[in-house]
Amino acid sequence: MALIGRYNSLQVVKHTNFGLYLDGGADGEILLPNRYIPKDIPSEDEDWLNVFIYLDSDDKLIATTEKPKVQVGEFASLKVVEVNSIGVFLDWGLPKDLLLPYSEEKRQMTAGEYVVVHVYLDKHTRRITATARLDRYLDKTPASYTPGQEVDLLVAEATDMGFKAIINNKHWGLIHKNEIFKFMRAGKEEKGFIKEVRSDGKISLSLQPVGEEAATSLNSKILAKLRDNNGTLPISDKSDPTLISSMFGVSKGNFKKAIGALYKNGQIVIHADRIELS
């Protein structure tokens, strides 16, 4: 049986004037229309094709070699292209827009905005469907991340404490406000780092490396910038946090630790309004 809403490697069983028919197992033969047949298939791979399976406008299984923006079981930020009496329709990169039923909204949506959704297969209709109700699709079991581990993040929503983000398509995490030093919005994809996995299972995130490796990296960055600026920079431990963030992308606290370590090592001199190479 073909996996609807996912990529499948399927065997070609029939050539016709309007496309290829692929073996969908219990689902029967699935059409790959001519417009989706690759022109450069190596001869040894002619009998098998990697295709995405979904339902066309007539609710028939169809194959495509086009790449959707998201597969079943994944999260993504998608643009609302239409809102009508049926529901909310999203652009997911395929000719037939993706339906988000009104029952799966968290709030009212309008055309042109972006929304973070999870994509699932409706068990009754076998239709690929989107939902903005994310909690039920995130893993609630204890996470096994380690502090400093690099992860993929999808920023999902703003909160009073910062931004909630989906970690590796599996878990909720939180980027606290004091860890944000650049423009942030829901739907943004970022590389991030595990800061802490708390005893209650909640995960704190950072947009910068953490731990000793991060400190070493920041120290090197400060020294390199000093060398590039004739050994002096108009910044110090008394500078405004905004200036520090714009120059190095870190918090004032982390910056003070870094220049303090460089000072102790005799590598720099700290003045009230600047730092200099020793």
Describe these PLM feature segments.
Residues 1-278:
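Single-stranded RNA-binding regions, centering on S1/OB-family and related RNA-binding modules
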